[in-house]
Amino acid sequence: MENNRFKSDEQSFLRLSQQREQNQRLKALFDNAVGEEEISLRDENVKHFNLGANRHQAVVYSEPVHFRNSEGDAWQEIDNTLEETVTAQGRQVLRNRANRMHVEFPQQMDGGNMASITENGRTFAWRFEQEAQPVQAVARTGAQLKQERLVARAQTMPKFVGRTVESLRSADLAAEIETAQEQRGDVAQLKAENTYESVLPGVSVRYTVMSNRVKEDIILANAEALSRTVIRLPKAFDYEVTDAAQLLVKDVQSGETVFMMDTPLVYDAAGKETLAAVELTDMGEYVRMEYRIDPLFMNDAVYPVTIDPVIHSTNAVHNIQDTTLGEGQSAKPYTADHLKIGKYSGTLRCVGLLQFETLAIPPAGNTIIGAVLRMHTMSGSTSNVVAAYEVLKPWESANVNWLNFDPDDTSNVSD
């Protein structure tokens, strides 16, 4: 008697296998399709690409990639490339090319403000209390920063064994390493960097402009240098330090918070972290801001030590919330620019939390054929495998930690 069920199962399996192979071929095809951006579909955090053959891709970013000056304007690409220019007052500065948030740095330290952010007609500027040395700015573009990241990635790949660092730096690594999908989704000009070496004894400063934020890295060569990091804030604003050590910059007339400095993260060369406290003193002509860091941390630290506050306006939009939970820890390192996953320093178990606030919703009738979360390793990884689990309860990055949101609790995170 013929086993029709067996034949039917065999045919179904064959069709499934063929479909899987076809899907893999199509995936490879569209991964390497150059694609053309559909500019009319832009949103603040989203780009759309037409890949041909009636296939489209939406790339959702964690922060704005587009800006517009008013509601009715078309979305423009943010370009934070730093360009040399001269202000109306004759000061030679570096200014970002295209953004609703305007950032300026002196081409050479000149006793004036080290940095300024202008948005919605208001400008917030600051500098060290001590006069900085006349150090020249060293600016790098987003493309240069991306190439540096690709060089580090290439050095871990077998195909580049035997290549010198110099040859990697001069190579078109994006073409050699990334798919067309990765290349079209990477908006390099979103980021730029500017560094002043040794502006004060033992103190260097590095600024990274990222979308609609400025990250300030104050780099200490030794413990004594901390005393030189006192910041001079203008009396044009009122200030408040929150319980979470955030600095609120307020309009004097309305009391509205118009700029904000996130809780300053502090880390040493070995990756050990803590948070800095912020202390304000009214000096009459200006407001004095000091960073207070645990003396035990400073004594045990492997130098250099970096203090890295992030400054932005209150209009800054972030499309994701993320943070790291350290087992048994109360810390809330949500201002860090990375997640820790796995064992930190070989002992502390860490879990990352990540959620998108807004996703790209396709038109009715469209079929979603794939979704990818793109992340990259910063350091310390011994494995490329990361497990993802559904989070079952709401959380806020500024408030969540292991003690109030245990990820081992299956009512918080699925198992």
Sequence positions of predicted segments:
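Extended extracellular/luminal ectodomain segments enriched in beta-structured repeat modules
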Residues: 223-228, 348-351, 361-372
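Flexible, small-residue-rich N-terminal segments that precede or flank a structured functional core
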Residues: 306-361, 396, 410-412
